[in-house]
Amino acid sequence: MATASARWNHVWVGTETGILKGVNLQRKHAANFTPSGQPRREEAVNALCWGTGGETQILVGCADRTVRYFNAEEGTFLSQRYCPGGEGTFRGLAQADGTLITCVDSGILRVWCENDKEASSDPLLELKVGPGVCRMRQDPTHTHVVATCGKENALKVWDLQGSEEPVFRAKNVRNDWLDLRVPIWDQDTQFLPGSQKLVTCTGYHQVRVYDPVSPQRRPVLEATYGEYPLTAMTLTPEGNSVIVGNTHGQLAEIDFRQGRLLGCLKGLAGSVRGLQCHPSKPLLASCGLDRVLRIHRIRNPRGLEHKVYLKSQLNCLLLSGRDNWEDEPQEPQEPNQVPSEDTETDELWASLEAAAKRKLPDLDQTQGALQRRKKKKRPGSTSP
């Protein structure tokens, strides 16, 4: 593993093959990190979050229901704990006041004592937030407050230090013009800075803003984009707009104050799985099923800044918030130990290229054969 330069990685990406990848954009270099040295699809990375000590530690949520603690400074896995309860994969991870917060597909949200990492330990708190959860998101200002949303599971806000009932429960929009119920499918949510408002994106290509302070529990603003389900969302550095991505790789910036489209970003070729903006720079990191990590500039001029192919399907990402991207010391690169699955992929492509070369005829030999055939023909003969 490349551990000496791990602290200078700009983006951390979780893959479907269970690999945590650290990407240095200045060097166009990606390092692979696995606790056992071999990738396993049973340990696919579904959720990532920073530890409470800044950006020195990463919490890695895997499909086998283990949460691994990764030292981002040294590039090593420190420990892990098993978090049972409910069914499905992690839909959100968070840390708050010495506790670990997990939430899974089936709607079981649990709070664990972080100091006790034994598998047999019981959770400090368990909440049933409803089935079909798509996302659990922590309030960055009040770390003990989280929001959950999902399919046929309306947006809810929970105070983990209060009662076991949500402090806010969103209400579905009114029936459509045929007086039919509108289905619920909230894919992602974000807390808006400087207020109690929340914004969600839906599987029916809508962006909605909710205000828990308002007397109504329905959205106070709604906008639509495209025709395909929205799968991921992130706030821009100014906090006045969001960037959403859909299942066809389309990215768009929407002003949630007026509900209008500000612009689009191009380049993706598959469903978007992860989006995150830099807190101070006009940069957006995106990843998805096309196995490519992209960094876009979201302010004039808009465009693609970096593009790194990472070989595996990408599920989630973390973008470093530091500002000194260009001022890093140039450390010697260590040889990267590529897991066996990536090595097999390279060998497969190499064999395909070799087979293609064997099938192509030699141009010189073909021309020589044609000339010999012409010389052997008798005078006055005509070609068929």
Swiss-Prot record:
The modification N6-methyllysine is found at K311. Its main location: nucleus. Keywords: Methylation, Nucleus, Phosphoprotein, Repeat, WD repeat. GO terms for biological process: blastocyst formation; ribosomal large subunit biogenesis; RNA metabolic process; rRNA processing. It is found in: Nucleus, Nucleolus; Nucleus. One of its GO terms (cellular component) is nucleus. Residues 320-384 are annotated as: Required for nucleolar and nuclear location. WD repeats lie at residues 40-80, 83-122, 128-168, 179-220, 224-266, 267-306. Pfam families: WD40 (PF00400). Residues 323-384 are annotated as: Disordered. Residues 371-384 have a biased composition (Basic residues). The modification Phosphoserine is found at S214. Isoform 1 interacts (through WDR repeats) with NVL; the interaction is independent of RNA or pre-60S ribosome particles. Isoform 2 does not interact with NVL. Interacts with MTREX; the interaction dissociation in a late stage of rRNA synthesis is required for appropriate maturation of pre-60S particles and depends on the ATPase activity of NVL. Regulatory protein of the MTREX-exosome complex involved in the synthesis of the 60S ribosomal subunit. Participates in an early cleavage of the pre-rRNA processing pathway in cooperation with NVL. Required for blastocyst formation, is necessary for RNA transcription, processing and/or stability during preimplantation development. This is WD repeat-containing protein 74. It comes from Mus musculus (Mouse). The lineage of its organism: Eukaryota, Metazoa, Chordata, Craniata, Vertebrata.
